[in-house]
């Protein structure tokens, strides 16, 4: 397995290095994307594909009276996220578990917000996975997607060739999947760096 395969599912030493790099390398994009999200101070949030845990730490600050849960199907990512957010976990404001978006381990209508930073590229069945997100969101809840690649630049093709199982979606493609899953009020934002943020609301 090449080092870059760890972007999909971090494992071993290479995976530990990758999740540490994720926390630093994606911070500017995450900050930009979160400018389009205004969660309530007491929001219940789920971060799907929590990677190195930095975004959960930020979400906990944005929701000082809320709780944030995280899932990742990489044991390395779960371990790192728990370390980064150990204080919040001890305080009962955060839980992190190994799980897949294909079958979220939550009851229906639990969350006000579900976030997905740099992860939908690797989701196995986007249509079904979006329906799972829809299921666990409360009515009126927000699904937030933030990607460094918007599917419209030459460099995007390079990454899909290097990383097996990676698919980069345009905002138009994501909107189609979201609408089929039942979402409404879909909005997309792009910048000159090619970053993409999409928000969608559960009916």
Task: Enumerate the language-model features and the residues they cover.
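C-terminal alpha-helical "lid/dimerization" subdomain adjacent to the S-adenosyl-L-methionine
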Residues: 4, 10-23, 27, 142-199
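Class I SAM-dependent methyltransferase SAM/SAH-binding core
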Residues: 44-103
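A short acidic, Gly/Pro-enriched loop at the edge of an enzyme's catalytic core
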Residues: 102-113
């Amino acid at each position: 397995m090449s080092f870059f395969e760890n972007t999909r599912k971090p494992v071993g030493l290479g995976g530990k290095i990758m999740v540490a790099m994720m926390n630093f390398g994606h911070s500017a994009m995450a900050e930009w994307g979160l400018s389009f999200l205004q969660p309530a101070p007491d929001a219940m949030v789920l971060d799907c594909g929590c990677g190195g845990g930095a975004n959960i730490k930020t979400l906990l600050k944005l929701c000082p009276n809320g709780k944030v849960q995280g899932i990742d199907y990489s044991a390395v990512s779960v371990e790192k996220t728990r370390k980064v957010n150990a204080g919040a976990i001890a305080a009962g404001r955060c839980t992190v578990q190994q799980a897949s978006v294909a079958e979220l381990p939550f009851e229906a209508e639990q969350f006000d917000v579900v976030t997905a930073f740099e992860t939908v590229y690797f989701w196995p069945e986007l249509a079904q996975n979006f329906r799972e997100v829809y299921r666990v969101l409360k009515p009126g809840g927000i699904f937030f997607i933030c990607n460094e690649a918007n599917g419209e630049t030459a460099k995007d093709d390079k990454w899909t060739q290097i990383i097996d199982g990676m698919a980069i979606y345009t905002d138009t493609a994501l909107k189609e999947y979201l609408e089929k899953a039942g979402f409404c009020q879909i909005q997309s934002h792009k910048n000159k760096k090619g970053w993409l943020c999409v928000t969608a609301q559960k009916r």
